[in-house]
Regions:
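Extracellular/lumenal mature domains of secreted and surface-exposed proteins
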Residues: 1-181
Length: 181
């Protein structure tokens, strides 16, 4: 076969921190100086387990909606929107290293309880119900993240995970038009 194993093995051991030349050129560190760094697979697994915000369904009208009337939906609760509540930086420890994870929502998949659904990247959505009933509304959030290990810069995590809100039952009623005069 031939060729070099890692690089030219004629390196000067004195300039390689006292390591034999082949180990210095192949990136080996002496015992006690090694830094074990978690890989993308470990970071992605931790990201999927950090307890991301599940979301909460809000609507206008809030308590009851009506057939043929637009109902506006958004994700959040009294404390803020889903993005504001869920996108804070978190730190986990993997293989002895501090890993900072910055999650962010990339899409919202709404299910309106009448068979209708809509996927959006942000903001409010509007839906018009065609029939009366108790509608089980939910939203699934798709998350991605950036991460940094130790003092390194942030980079894309290269994957996604999802969380789904608790179902919110929204009563939808028929409205009767009343004419006066």
């Amino acid at each position: 076969m031939g060729g070099a194993f890692c690089a030219d093995t004629n390196a000067d051991a004195a300039t390689a921190g006292g390591l034999p030349p082949i180990q210095a050129l192949c990136g080996f560190l002496p015992v006690g100086r090694a830094r074990v760094v978690p890989g993308r697979v470990e970071v992605l697994a931790a990201f999927r387990e950090i307890g991301l915000y599940r979301g909460a369904v809000r609507s206008d009208p809030e308590r009851v909606s009506f057939v043929n009337l637009e109902t506006y939906f958004w994700c959040g609760d009294g404390a803020g929107t889903c993005a504001a509540l869920g996108e804070g930086e978190r730190t986990v420890t993997l293989l002895g290293q501090a890993v900072r994870i910055r999650p962010r929502i990339v899409s919202y998949e709404w299910r309106f309880g009448d068979g209708g659904s809509q996927s959006v990247i942000a903001g409010r959505v509007a839906h018009t119900y065609g029939r009366a009933g108790a509608m089980a509304v939910s939203v699934t959030l798709t998350w991605t993240a950036d991460y940094a290990i130790g003092g390194d810069g942030f980079r894309a995590i290269g994957g996604t995970t999802t969380t789904t809100s608790p179902v919110r039952v929204l009563p939808v009623q028929e409205a009767e038009t009343v004419s006066s005069g």
